[in-house]
Amino acid sequence: MSTALLLGFAMLLDAALGEPEWLWSRLRHPAVLIGDIISVLDDELNEGGHRRLKGVAVTAILAVGALSVGALLSLLGPVAEVLICAILLAQKSLAGHVADVADALRLSLPEARRSVARIVSRDTATMSEPQVARAAIESAAENLSDGVIAPAFWFLVGGLPGLLLYKTINTADSMVGYMNERYAQFGWAAARLDDLLNLIPARLTCGMIVLLSNGWRHWRGIVEDAQRHISPNAGWPEAAMARALNIALAGPRSYHGEIRHLAWVNEEGRKEIGPREIERAVTLLWQVWALALGLTLTLVALAAIF
C-alpha cells in the first residue's frame, strides 16, 4: 500500500475523530511523551558550560531516536501506520480550538481571552477584541503549517520515521527553541533544524492558501511580509492568510508584560476584526485540508497509473 494512500486514510481519520477526550484523558498522547523526554534532557543537561554543544547532542539523540522508533513502528503494518499518522495530525483539533475562540468572542471578551490563551503563548489578559481575533487567526495559519501540512509532507517523504522526526524536532523547538538566557544556546540546534524541516511545508501552505483565495496578485506583498517576519517560516502562511481575509495580522503584542512591536503583516488590511474573520479563517483551514487531501489522492492515482 502506497504511503500516499496511507496518508489519505490518516487525514480522513483525523478529520473525523480528532483527539477524543475519552481516549487521551486515559492515555499519554505521543506528543506529550516526546515532551516528557525533552523535559528530562533539559533538566539534566541544560546547565553549566558548553550548552550549545550539549544542545546539538540532545537534538542529534532526539533525531536518531525518532527515526529509529519510526522504523520499528513501521514494522507493525499499514493499519498501525494510519493510526499513528492520524494521531500526529491536528486538523480537527486545530479547527476546533480556533472556532472556540470565535464562539467565546460572541459571548464575552473575558471568555474569549481565556479561550485564546489555550492556543497562544502571548499575554491575553488585556487583549481587545481585534487582538484576540488576530491571535487566533495567526495561530490558525502557523499551526496549519506546523500541525497539518508539515507532518503530512514528512510522512509522504519518509513514512513514520520522517513523521516522528518532524514531530519530535518541532516539539523540541516549541519547548527549548527560545532566544532567552536559558535556551539561546541549548535550544539553538533544535530551533535551526525545525526551521529547516519547515522550510518547504510553510511555503506549500502559503501556496495552497494563495491558490484557494485567488491571491496571486498579492504575491509580491506576501513575499515581502514573509521576509520581514520574525520567523523564517511562519510568516509565509500568515501573510497568505492575511491577504486571503483582507486583514492585518501581527503588530504589537505583549509577552510576559513586555510590549513587542512586531512588523504588521498586510498593514493595509482591516485591523478592526472579530469572530466573523475567525470563522472565515476556520473555513479556509478546511479548504486547505481538502486541497491537501485531493493532492494526496492525485499522487495515489498517478502511482496506480505509472
From Swiss-Prot:
Keyword Lipid metabolism on entry: no
Cellular compartments annotated: Cell membrane
Keyword line: Cell membrane, Cobalamin biosynthesis, Membrane, Transmembrane, Transmembrane helix
Highest rank taxon of the organism: Bacteria
Pfam families, A to Z: CobD_Cbib
Pathway(s) this gene product operates in, as recorded in its UniProt entry: Cofactor biosynthesis; adenosylcobalamin biosynthesis
Primary location: membrane
Any GO BP annotation: cobalamin biosynthetic process
GO molecular function per UniProt: ABC-type vitamin B12 transporter activity; threonine-phosphate decarboxylase activity
Topology with respect to the bilayer: Multi-pass membrane protein
Transmembrane spans: 69-89, 146-166, 286-306
GO cellular component: a single term: plasma membrane
InterPro entries per record: Cobalamin_biosynth_CobD/CbiB
Family according to the record: Belongs to the CobD/CbiB family.
UniProt function note: Converts cobyric acid to cobinamide by the addition of aminopropanol on the F carboxylic group.
Protein name: Cobalamin biosynthesis protein CobD
Native source organism of the sequence: Ruegeria pomeroyi (strain ATCC 700808 / DSM 15171 / DSS-3) (Silicibacter pomeroyi)
